[in-house]
Amino acid sequence: MPWFPVKKVRKQMKLLLLLLLLTCAAWLTYVHRSLVRPGRALRQRLGYGRDGEKLTGVTDSRGVRVPSSTQRSEDSSESHEEEQAPEGRGPNMLFPGGPRKPPPLNLTHQTPPWREEFKGQVNLHVFEDWCGGAVGHLRRNLHFPLFPHTRTTVTKLAVSPKWKNYGLRIFGFIHPARDGDIQFSVASDDNSEFWLSLDESPAAAQLVAFVGKTGSEWTAPGEFTKFSSQVSKPRRLMASRRYYFELLHKQDDKGSDHVEVGWRAFLPGLKFEIIDSAHISLYTDESSLKMDHVAHVPQSPASHIGGFPPQGEPSADMLHPDPRDTFFLTPRMEPLSLENVLEPCAYAPTYILKDFPIARYQGLQFVYLSFIYPNDHTRLTHMETDNKCFYRESPLYLERFGFYKYMKMDKEEGEEDEEEEVQRRAFLFLNPDDFLDEEDEQDLLDSLEPTDASVQQSHRTPTPAASTGTTASPTPPTTSPLDEQTLRHSRALNWAPRPLPLFLGRAPPPRTVEKSPSKVYVTRVRPGQRASPRALRDSPWPPFPGVFLRPKPLPRVQLRVPPHPPRTQGYRTSGPKVTELKPPVRAQTSQGGREGQLHGQGLMVPTVDLNSSVETQPVTSFLSLSQVSRPQLPGEGEEGEEDGAPGDEATSEDSEEEEEPAAGRPLGRWREDAINWQRTFSVGAMDFELLRSDWNDLRCNVSGNLQLPEAEAVDVVAQYMERLNAKHGGRFSLLRIVNVEKRRDSARGSRFLLELELQERGGSRQRLSEYVFLRLPGARVGDEDGESPEPPPAASIHPDSRPELCRPLHLAWRQDVMVHFIVPVKNQARWVVQFLADMTALHVHTGDSYFNIILVDFESEDMDVERALRAAQLPRYQYLKRTGNFERSAGLQTGVDAVEDPSSIVFLCDLHIHFPPNILDSIRKHCVEGKLAFAPVVMRLGCGSSPWDPHGYWEVNGFGLFGIYKSDFDRVGGMNTEEFRDQWGGEDWELLDRVLQAGLEVERLRLRHFYHHYHSKRGMWATRSRKGARAQRS
């Protein structure tokens, strides 16, 4: 190409390369900005650890997962739009076939139109009756963030409802007063988070300040600098723009609830000021919207739906996978393949109460439980820390002694026999004959007034000969005035002469004494009467015979005194004081021995010196036996140290705090308990399930289904498989036993529900789910209707008189029967929406279309229930409207009356239920027309608990969730609508009585993943609050 300027290009090569480089840089900059603008950053998140393991998130000490958007909140340039919650179980993940990956977040990018009249207030959403103190606990709420309990507004960012167990979501726009760098700070009790967007879009909100993550952090009102996380970095804001913000707050049941947001210009010395109405505005006006309208509710990285619960080891055993949860999806065997496998037999158990009169509400006593194999892990083992009723032990006994009685400690060399150990550790039992009778007790009451000392001395004071056992004059010695005053307020106790110590432990070696006195005087003394140290040294305190074999220090006692003690002689009374023990006064005796010194003297007890005057009447107190002992005298710290034993180291439960010895005082004689780290023990295998029976235990609400022994289940399955292969020539092989349920009848036999996974030769896996009856030898029952008489017993039992399986007549369940869920509702918008969403998910993930939803609406004002039913993707639904107050019995009866097919199942349901994926299959299996009704046990979730972290108890007393055929429901008379009207509670028990009297069995089982949501009861009974609020309630 002669026209191409090759020489010029060669000369300007460097300029051309620079131009090319600048062009590439400009193009890359344009591409980067175009991708970053909608929130898709090019850089890769550092989501992998050192060893290549993926980091799923951060979990705090309480198990609350910290959202990934808050882990790097300081990086304001990072977009949070594509951040997703960790993989796990979402609301639909309990259903088989659900999505394995979380759906993308539907964050709000477009804001609704804003008007000038929005200024001066912001939106406030309240989530009531939800426990926990962390914002993560609020995000666990089933209705967060779209369906709050209350929608209202607030005029400044400082809220204190003076309530407990709630969560707040405050959102709107902030209007800065001037351009510049602004710092924000949040303070609250308990945790809170403040999110701020760089513009008016909720999708761009970033966490800028927060108080705690675990729920234990809090601040005082206006304390903006307690935590470093409270204060944000400076943010460049412009007065001409508005910025979306969001404030999340969680309050538990303690403390002074408050949450406030302050701001200040980024200048030295300025303090934070509350953001008031002049600088805030509404996000949107919700006053005219019903509670089921949620399209306007903003979803931001702080508050959005679609996040899954945190991953981790399940806290409950019931959350682990079980074949029962998905076995209903396996194709069922054709009924023709099971005909004539077992011979038919009549089924009429002896526990049927047909036409048997029972008292009101006594049907609970005639409901029996079924045995399950294999273990379905419905026992709430994670709740047994607080409730140990499963072990059939007294809670007080377990708290005091634990489970040591099930352990046999191994003996060591030189250790005494176990029986001697028991005797050595026995408690002191006093002889009742040695205590005072009623007359003596009356004398004791009279002794509170000054009486003649000689009378009391003649009754209660032993002679020296009696107390010492030596030959002396029978005349009592003269006593000092101090002894007379002491004896006036004395009480004699005749101790039983037992050599056992009072406290547990090794008994100290006996001491050589001449003879123990038969009575001990416990006296009250006046303050100011104290013996000299010399008298104490010369007269040591003798131990009580048979009670204490060595001295024990008396703990300091705090006595209860009147709040306003009387004043005497102008002296000022002082408050209660803890006084020290006063040593005993040496009495005048005619004996010089140690034992003779006990006569005529009393035990000094600690008193409270209310006045400084001696004339003031003393405040006295009777002490327990463990406190009646000699105080440790000075200089006796090391005396008798070698005589001690572990049993002497036990102290009173009231004296938990030990006094530190003063300088120069010798340490006490008490030694630390010895710990034997090498102690071993023997124990046998304990099966506490053997202690349970099929009686409906109404006292223990954490125990699971009864466990069927494996040998019994395997034996029944082996008999059935033998008969099945005998008919089909070995065409089926057993893969596994999925479920076996047994209802016991000790007189005629047991009913079994067998659910087996079989493999057909050359075919696919199939599901066998049939009722069989294990008839006892010699048991013969005629059919109720006279149809299909039972063959004689000789032809139906084995020669060795073994029980044999047979097919119970009229006890076959239908797989394609229609199930009608009947739910009465009123002003429960958020729960109606959740119920319809759960039913839609049940239809989508199971593919089962044989169910119908019947909602009976009592003039709900917070939503259009009929419109919500039409919008839901349900196979069938019916909307029934009633007027007046809410009546559960009338609502249920109205729903049943709307069912036309008598051979369909009606399930009397509640609105706040979380259903397991196999709920339809469970209802059909346990409802047989004319024979069986089904009352599954639901687990009531506690406050702040969710289906993915269930904490609660089984509702063993409730029968409100009830499945029964329409024909049987009509035959028993339906609901009692006359007696149970405005209130509910008891209508389920009354229905149960009539169902049992009609001759039906009621199957009672605890279902896995079957929960009753914890919900607020405020507003459910149309109650009025003392002070109305401008709010919409759901």
Swiss-Prot record:
Task: Please state the protein's primary subcellular location.
Answer: Golgi
Instruction: Give the PA14 domain ranges.
Output: 109-279
Q: Extract the coiled-coil ranges from the record.
A: none
UniProt cross-references to SMART domains, sorted A to Z: PA14
Keyword Transmembrane (UniProt): yes
Locate the transmembrane regions by residue number: 13-31
Q: What class of enzyme is it?
A: transferase
Membrane association type: Single-pass type II membrane protein
Q: Which of the residues are on side Cytoplasmic?
A: 1-12
Q: Which residues form the signal peptide?
A: none
Q: Where is the composition biased (Low complexity)?
A: 461-473
Entry EC no(s): 2.4.1.244
Keywords of this protein's UniProt record, alphabetized?
Answer: Glycoprotein, Golgi apparatus, Membrane, Signal-anchor, Transferase, Transmembrane, Transmembrane helix
Q: Which family does it belong to?
A: Belongs to the chondroitin N-acetylgalactosaminyltransferase family.
The name on file for this protein is: N-acetyl-beta-glucosaminyl-glycoprotein 4-beta-N-acetylgalactosaminyltransferase 1
Q: Where is the composition biased (Basic and acidic residues)?
A: 72-83
Which intervals carry biased composition (Acidic residues)? 636-661
Carbohydrate-modified residues are N106, N611
Function in brief: Transfers N-acetylgalactosamine (GalNAc) from UDP-GalNAc to N-acetylglucosamine-beta-benzyl with a beta-1,4-linkage to form N,N'-diacetyllactosediamine, GalNAc-beta-1,4-GlcNAc structures in N-linked glycans and probably O-linked glycans.
Q: Which GO terms describe its molecular function?
A: acetylgalactosaminyltransferase activity; glucuronosyl-N-acetylgalactosaminyl-proteoglycan 4-beta-N-acetylgalactosaminyltransferase activity; N-acetyl-beta-glucosaminyl-derivative 4-beta-N-acetylgalactosaminyltransferase activity
The question of whether Flavoprotein is a record keyword is answered with no
Reactions listed under catalytic activity: an N-acetyl-beta-D-glucosaminyl derivative + UDP-N-acetyl-alpha-D-galactosamine = an N-acetyl-beta-D-galactosaminyl-(1->4)-N-acetyl-beta-D-glucosaminyl derivative + UDP + H(+)
